[in-house]
Structures are given as structure tokens and as C-alpha cells.
Amino acid sequence: MKISSFVLKSVFVSSMIFCFGNITAADPKNNKAPKLEYFGSLTYRDIGEGKNFSRNFVANLGSGTLTLANGDIGKVSAPCADFGNAQKELWFDLDVRCTFTMEDGAHLYIFYGGKMIMDDKAKELMDEGKPWKPKNGIKYWINAPLIRTSSQKYDYMNYIQLIGKGIIADLSAGYVTYDLYKVLYQKL
């Protein structure tokens, strides 16, 4: 009885090691970050102030432009807002949801979460009415947009993941700009 119990335990432990070993084993030579391809840019203007907020805020994004790498252009159409959350002083979680109308009349619904973390220069630049840029007011500013549409022309957008990198935030002038990149998937 003791021998069969020992054998069963040994088989079980060996199986678990084999299974978990295959699940967690990684090949460092092939463990590469995904590649990115420039997709376009996104600019919001007429950003409404999130007045008197202590943590959560809603900032209306009154107008803006989505410019695709192929030259197609879309404009913000309501609704469009950032339902943000101030985590710490000058550290924001972004929760943006917007509708864009393309020149051909197609509608794109863009939504994303992200992080915007300012550096030590941010307050001084804001007091002087100067814009924030990476390494000059912004320490980290990234988001992960998804797009939904019923347009046949833009249907491919339903199946891609974008990464947005903040380029400039000029809150005194009321605009921000992102560069957008498409994540390129590699077949395994």
C-alpha cells in the first residue's frame, strides 16, 4: 500500500512539474517585444476643465482630429470626454471615450485607458503657461486605444490594438496630441 501511494504521489508530482515547466518555460532568444507601426495622430482641443475635483473628474473634449497615416481624417463628434482619476499629485489615470466622424461619414468609437505622470518640472511649466512634453513636464504618458466601427472601410480597426504615446499637453491652450502606433502581431 505504501509503495503504491508513493508511486502515485511521484507520478502526480512529476506530472505537475512537467505541466508547469511547459507553461512557464520561456525561450529568451524568441521572447521579443511586439513591433509597432505608425498609425496616425490624435489631437484634442477645447479641453474642458475638471473643476473642483479632489480625485475623479470628467473633462469634456470639445473638438479634435484623428489623422491616419494614409491621410484619412476624422473629427470629434459628441460625446467625447476623459473620465479621469487623479491618483497622486500630477499622476492621472485616463479613461477616454470619443466618437469621431471620418470625412466619408463613417463613425469610429475610440476608447482607451492610460497613464499620465508628470515630472518635477510640470508645476513650474503649468504656472508659466508652457506646454508639457516628454522629459520636460511629462515623465510617462501612454495609453492603449481600441476602435469600434460598423464601417466596411475601417472594419480592420475592430481587430487591432493601438498604443498611444503622448507628445504634447498644453493645458493653458487646451489641447493634447498623441502619436498612435499599431501593434504588429507575429505568428507563433
What are these regions (language model features)?
Residues M1-V11:
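Bacterial N-terminal signal peptides that target proteins for export
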Residues S10-C19:
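Bacterial N-terminal signal peptides
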Residues F18-P28:
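Bacterial Sec-dependent signal peptides at the C-terminal "C-region" and cleavage site
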Residues A26-L188:
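Beta-strand-enriched cores of mature, soluble protein domains
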